[in-house]
């Protein structure tokens, strides 16, 4: 009897073991490299791989499945590609490309995969996000209505940028495009805006210089730099903007404000063209692939002003495009102009003639316009664009005319002084209330009897005078964001007083 009980126990134990048995077998779909060149591997055997999926090679290198062909897969290598050769095996990871996001990245320099490259140790990010995300839909957005002050008089007065807008900075090389972008970052100090600077295909020395400028100004406290330098592969240069925008979306979706700069998208398009041609995709105009428009539209559409239900956060994009000999009708410039909400044109001729920032006021527009300006700026800068346009027209005409009538001469003199007023030094953004004071002085005729060569000195001394003696006027403009009758009376009296002091000197 005892033996029978023992047999029952044994059989129940065996049954229990069978019921609870788990076969922990790691099943992976694997493949082998059949050819490898220029950072692209053709892999055979990954039958069920998804487009954009991560593929891991036996030496730890990772790649991105880009071309899904009948018999093989074109995999873009996300690294140096050392040790990869024909016959190297690889496996599917079953994940799409992700990047770390969050507050931990602020103040850091990362590569196109979100990995730190500044020598300050690992980043303790608590969250990751997919690099390729859909842009917010119409109902998730709100129209752009809050100003994003750049600190640059010519932009804030004439082509204002709003939070959630996409404003293109376009011009030839060495016209000050990056400087405009960096000054905008510097001006966000204390504005509770997280800035992301994405460098694509730049020299490492240039990036080091930008980071040094940001550190010296204390701007790295609210800035993240994403760098895919000229030494990096075309795949990493292609990915960098998407990594940057994903990092920015974290802040946008959490009710904060972000500013992202892509420097520059011309090199981004070139990197994508290089990648596409190696993948043997059919070339189109200027040898770019057919989806180069979508490359930039899906990136820039992710900048948005979110609705109140979604937290009312925003992400503003300032893409940069480099033109060749001022040709804004080339393929990539026209594409990006049509995607963005306006553009700031920088001209070589203006730059060389000492007008810096070299903004062509006639060609630069903001399609958001007055909605992105405070009332005080609208009050003082309303007529400025028109008078500058008239000045440019008269300037060309006046070169041939010997005797000018009084009205024309006055228009020319006002134009000359306003051009001087809009000049600004490198990395010297100006707070909006000071911009308003000097533009008010210019448009209301307080500069008419000041020599053109003295206008820059007049402005510098005016700001110092207001800081010392009439800071209450600056504070009133900043607080109310408009010039009421009382403020205007005080402003006029202060300007008269300053002119007396200035002329005496």
Curated annotation (Swiss-Prot):
Localization (cell): Cell inner membrane
Top class in the EC scheme: translocase
Membrane topology: Peripheral membrane protein
Main location: membrane
Taxonomy, superkingdom: Bacteria
PROSITE patterns named among the record's database cross-references: ATPASE_ALPHA_BETA
Quaternary structure annotation from Swiss-Prot or TrEMBL: F-type ATPases have 2 components, CF(1) - the catalytic core - and CF(0) - the membrane proton channel. CF(1) has five subunits: alpha(3), beta(3), gamma(1), delta(1), epsilon(1). CF(0) has three main subunits: a(1), b(2) and c(9-12). The alpha and beta chains form an alternating ring which encloses part of the gamma chain. CF(1) is attached to CF(0) by a central stalk formed by the gamma and epsilon chains, while a peripheral stalk is formed by the delta and b chains.
Name of the protein in its database record: ATP synthase subunit alpha
Source species: Aliarcobacter butzleri (strain RM4018) (Arcobacter butzleri)
Lineage: Bacteria, Pseudomonadati, Campylobacterota, Epsilonproteobacteria, Campylobacterales
Gene name for this UniProt entry: atpA
């Amino acid at each position: 009897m005892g033996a029978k009980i023992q047999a029952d126990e044994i059989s129940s134990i065996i049954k229990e073991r069978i019921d609870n048995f788990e076969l922990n077998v790691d099943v992976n779909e694997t493949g082998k490299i059949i050819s490898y060149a220029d950072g692209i591997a053709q892999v055979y055997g990954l039958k069920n791989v998804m487009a954009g999926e991560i593929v891991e090679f036996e030496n730890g290198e990772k790649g991105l499945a880009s071309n899904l062909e009948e018999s093989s897969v074109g995999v873009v290598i996300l690294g140096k590609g050392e040790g990869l050769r024909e016959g190297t095996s690889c496996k599917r990871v079953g994940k799409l490309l992700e990047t770390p996001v969050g507050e931990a990245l602020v103040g850091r320099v990362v590569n196109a995969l979100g990995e730190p490259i500044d020598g300050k140790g690992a980043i303790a990010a608590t969250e990751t996000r997919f690099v390729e995300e859909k842009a917010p839909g119409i109902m998730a957005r709100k129209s752009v209505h809050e100003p994003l002050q750049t600190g640059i008089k010519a932009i804030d007065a004439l082509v204002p940028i709003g939070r959630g807008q996409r404003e293109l900075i376009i011009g030839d090389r060495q016209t000050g495009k990056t400087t405009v972008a960096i000054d905008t970052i510097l001006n966000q100090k204390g504005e509770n805006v997280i800035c992301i600077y994405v460098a694509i295909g730049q020299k490492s020395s240039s990036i080091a210089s930008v980071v040094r400028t940001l550190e010296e100004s204390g701007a790295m406290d609210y800035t993240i730099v994403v760098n895919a330098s000229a030494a990096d592969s075309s795949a990493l240069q292609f990915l960098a903007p998407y990594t940057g925008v994903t990092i920015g979306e974290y802040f946008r979706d959490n009710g904060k404000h972000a500013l992202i700069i892509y420097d520059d998208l011309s090199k981004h398009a070139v990197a994508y063209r290089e990648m596409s041609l190696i993948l043997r995709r059919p070339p189109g105009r200027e040898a770019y692939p057919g989806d180069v428009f979508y490359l930039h539209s899906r990136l820039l559409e992710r900048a948005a002003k979110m609705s109140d239900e979604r937290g009312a956060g925003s992400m503003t994009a300032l893409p940069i495009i480099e033109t060749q000999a001022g040709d804004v009708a080339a393929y990539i410039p026209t594409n990006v102009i049509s995607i963005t909400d306006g553009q700031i044109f920088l001209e070589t001729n203006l730059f060389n003639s000492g007008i810096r920032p070299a903004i062509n006021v006639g060609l630069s527009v903001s399609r958001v316009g007055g909605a992105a300006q405070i009332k005080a700026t609208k009050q003082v800068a309303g007529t400025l664009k028109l008078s500058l346009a008239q000045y440019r027209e008269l300037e060309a005409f006046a070169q041939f005319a010997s005797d000018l009538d009084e009205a024309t001469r006055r228009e020319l003199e006002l134009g000359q002084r306003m051009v001087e007023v809009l000049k600004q030094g490198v990395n010297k953004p100006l707070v909006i209330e000071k911009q308003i004071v000097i533009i008010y002085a210019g448009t209301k005729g307080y500069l008419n009897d000041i020599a053109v060569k003295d206008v820059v000195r007049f402005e510098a001394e005016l700001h110092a005078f207001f800081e010392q003696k009439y800071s209450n006027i600056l504070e009133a403009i900043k607080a109310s964001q408009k010039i009421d009758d009382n403020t205007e009376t005080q402003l006029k009296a202060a300007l008269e007083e300053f002119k007396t002091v200035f002329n005496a000197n």
